[in-house]
UniProtKB/Swiss-Prot annotation:
The keyword Cell cycle does not apply. It comes from Gluconobacter oxydans (strain 621H). This is Large ribosomal subunit protein uL6. PANTHER family: 60S/50S RIBOSOMAL PROTEIN L6/L9, LARGE RIBOSOMAL SUBUNIT PROTEIN UL6M. Pfam families: Ribosomal_L6. The keyword Membrane does not apply. Part of the 50S ribosomal subunit.
Length: 178
């Protein structure tokens, strides 16, 4: 069983945290985020640390929400102080991406360009035509936007063409033999 919940979350300088009405709020240089707090746990702010403890008797719900709530609070604090980023790579002949206004325009081998509107609170950059960087303060939204972009053309196992995460290792397959 994981013991993630027992470790306190350190709050860096410049981040203000509060707990009220079943919500944990964190405010920092990259914005403000709110996380709902389960009724199965209790959140305490002690100086520059935030600790989470299960409420009442030792039940499965209390213990599962203990670690989950602690992880959500840690992601919220890191998001408003440092932010999150996810890198994507595009492989394939003629495949490329560019940011035009508030849209990400990608050529992915279709007869048309793929236009993805950039959501509010997310920053997308293209350091080079075959690389995309998704940045933001909410870890879940950054991951979801990266997944949406990847889903336009998932990497195929034979030639490796498509959009992949920069840390993704693609299992290649061998083609048919005569």
């Amino acid at each position: 069983m994981s013991r993630v919940g027992k470790y306190p979350v350190e709050v860096p300088a410049g981040v203000q945290v509060s707990v009220a009405d079943g919500f944990f709020k964190a405010k920092g240089k990259l914005g403000e985020l709110t996380v709902p707090v389960s009724r199965h746990v209790e959140v305490k702010i002690e100086g520059s640390n935030v600790s989470v403890a299960p409420v009442g008797r030792r039940s499965r719900e209390n213990w599962t929400m203990w670690g989950t709530t602690r992880a959500l609070i840690a992601n919220t604090v890191k998001g408003v102080s440092d932010g999150f980023s996810k890198g994507l790579e595009i492989q394939g002949t003629g495949f490329r991406a560019a940011v035009q206004g508030s849209n990400l325009v990608m050529n992915l081998g279709f007869s048309h360009d793929v236009v993805y509107p950039i959501p509010e609170g997310i920053k997308i950059t293209t350091p080079r035509p075959t690389a995309i960087v998704v940045e933001g303060n909410d870890k879940q939204r950054v991951g979801q936007v990266a997944l949406d972009i990847r889903s336009f053309r998932k990497p195929e196992p034979y030639k490796g063409k498509g959009v992949r995460y920069e840390t993704e290792v693609l299992r290649r397959k061998e083609g048919k033999k005569k």
